Swiss-Prot record:
Binds 1 FMN per subunit. It is a peripheral membrane protein. The active site is at 175 (nucleophile). The gene is pyrD. Its EC number is 1.3.5.2. PANTHER family: DIHYDROOROTATE DEHYDROGENASE (QUINONE), MITOCHONDRIAL (PTHR48109:SF4), DIHYDROOROTATE DEHYDROGENASE (QUINONE), MITOCHONDRIAL-RELATED (PTHR48109). It catalyses: (S)-dihydroorotate + a quinone = orotate + a quinol. Belongs to the dihydroorotate dehydrogenase family. Type 2 subfamily. This is Dihydroorotate dehydrogenase (quinone). It comes from Pseudoalteromonas translucida (strain TAC 125). Substrate binds at residues 66, 111-115, 172, 177, 246-247. Pathway: Pyrimidine metabolism; UMP biosynthesis via de novo pathway; orotate from (S)-dihydroorotate (quinone route): step 1/1. GO terms for biological process: 'de novo' pyrimidine nucleobase biosynthetic process; 'de novo' UMP biosynthetic process. It comes from the Bacteria.
């Protein structure tokens, strides 16, 4: 009821304004009685993933809480795990506004935010202040003005900063909104990056005396040869897991709708089939050896089960959560 009213109001406003308005209020009121408006008790459905003990297999995808300002509020909603970021070494403003558009006819969003965030030091301070004891993923990226040849330096910088504060780390090489970033998903560039990051991870494990799994987030816009190459590279470099998928550049599913031709990544219902296909292919190509978090177009029980049946160990929601609210978490967890 509360979310229906809130959504009705926010959907009359600019999409990014509504996003910031929601985050500001979640952050402001998380430790007050007003948090009862979104808090809910969700039955425990424990799952072990990469040695991490989760209360349930439904997580918040990266991109919603880029600066880790609302961890407490999202925990109150019942997420089994929360992923914050994408964060970069230095603060950056992102792309020009407007840069976020709703396609309500398809329960979808197009965004070209461009990794807008306040930088990794700010995120780490927010994580410390939250005192969150649940499972926290931290999603890392490179600054827009960092050349791809030096991209691994940005990822390593972020890894070092977040390592002791993260339950797992996600390497984002699949956002379509940082020029050239997706080129890191292919061939020698991918192997070079993953080898460097794996070596850094092993050094950090030795330094801090704790295991922090490293996952890679990939795009849905991969052809069969590319999916096979990515799978081989993830396995050969002993990457701990994969998140499939990010947003799509494909527009055929929303052709003719308002904002359909806006540049950026499309998320929500239209990416569901593509994301599920990538999950299924990853499962097949790796012989089930690679733990998978499925994300993309999950906005009800059947779409969550579809990802799990395709091979995902866990699921994440973002756009579906924007359209359906905290009740979506509860309905999915109850059904699993």
């Amino acid at each position: 009821m509360f979310y229906d009213l809130a959504r009705r109001f926010m959907f009359t406003r600019d999409a990014e304004w509504a996003h910031e308005f929601a985050l500001n209020n979640l952050s402001r009121f998380a430790n007050t009685p007003l948090s009862a408006a979104w808090s809910q008790n969700i039955v425990n459905k424990p799952v072990n993933f990469l040695g991490l003990e989760l209360k349930n297999p439904v997580g918040l995808a990266a991109g919603l809480d880029k600066n880790a300002e609302c961890i407490t509020a999202f925990a109150q909603m019942g997420f089994g795990f929360v992923e914050v970021g994408t964060v970069t070494p230095r603060p950056q403003a992102g792309n020009d506004k407007p840069r976020m558009f709703r396609l309500p006819q398809s329960n979808a969003i197009i965004n070209r935010m461009g990794f807008n965030n306040k930088g990794v030091d700010n995120l780490v301070n927010n994580v410390k202040a939250a005192n969150y004891t649940g499972i926290l993923g931290i999603n890392i990226g490179k600054n827009k003005d960092t050349p791809n040849e030096q991209g691994k330096d940005d990822y390593i910088h972020c890894m070092r900063k977040v390592f002791e504060h993260a339950s797992y780390i996600t390497v984002n090489i699949s956002s379509p909104n940082t020029p050239g970033l997706r080129d890191l998903q292919y061939g020698a560039a991918l192997d070079d990056l993953l080898q460097s990051l794996k070596n850094e991870q092993l050094d950090l494990v030795a330094k801090h005396g704790k295991q922090v799994p490293m996952l890679v987030k990939i795009a849905p816009d991969l052809d069969p040869i590319q999916i096979a190459q990515v799978s081989e590279s993830l396995l050969s470099n002993k990457i701990d897991g994969v998140i499939a998928t990010n947003t799509t550049l494909e527009r055929s599913m929303v052709a003719g709708q308002q904002y359909a031709d806006e540049a950026g990544g499309l998320s929500g219902q239209p990416v569901r089939e593509r994301a599920t296909h990538v999950v299924s292919e990853l499962k097949r190509l790796t012989n089930g050896q690679l733990p998978i978090i499925g994300v993309g177009g999950i906005d009800d029980v059947s779409s969550a089960k579809e990802k799990i049946n395709a091979g995902a160990d866990l699921v994440q929601i973002y756009t579906g959560f924007i359209y359906k609210g905290p009740q979506l978490i509860k309905s999915i967890v109850d059904s699993l």
